[in-house]
Amino acid sequence: MKKFLITILALCCAACNSDWRKQYDEVAPTRTENMMVRKGDKYGLVSPKGLEITPVKYDYIDTNPPQDMPFYDVTINNLRGIIKPSGEEIIPAKYDFIWYSQGVFVVKLNDSYQLLDSHNKSLTPWFDEIDVFYQGLAFAKNTGYYGFLNPKGELVLPFVYDDADHFNESGYAMVKYKGKWGMIDKKGNTKLPFEYEHAEPYSEPTEEWEDYYYMLIKNGKELTIDKEGNFL
């Protein structure tokens, strides 16, 4: 009799484990053992046994992010947040946009930008602009001028530039200072003097974007340099 009851309970549990899917309009796999579910037009995450590990409240969950992004982008009412694949909320869905870059998040709200860490801690005040990180630095704009931040939110190069491009893989960036463009290294040392009216990166159609050059204009004349600042 005891064995019979155990068998009945086991069958009931198996039925319960499979029946949980019926309450959802869609059940989809993710990169982990957890699954994404949809009820109406709302999404959430559940465990393999059907236990909800997030509320089914999101308008969108990106369960297939880029390989370097170990989190899920979520959306509620066109505002974005971040959750872990385990369902834990990292950043509430209250930002206009979120970028993940070198272990931290660039968030945008009402045309202002801020850096947050993976614990939703503010690393910077609000700025007019923050780019994603290239070669360990990101340009930021504050009160009309550009400088460069590291992923800790520290200001590495001061807000003195009129305009800025990101650092290339050779460790140089084109920046505009007192109305003219030049090239600097990561310490702010001048690689190319500030004497050009225009600077624009480009690549040949047959080359990868990483293999780009800069087109410069000085006194109306076009010049070309490579990523190290050498004239071609």
Give residue spans per PLM region.
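Sec-dependent N-terminal signal peptides
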Residues: F4-C12
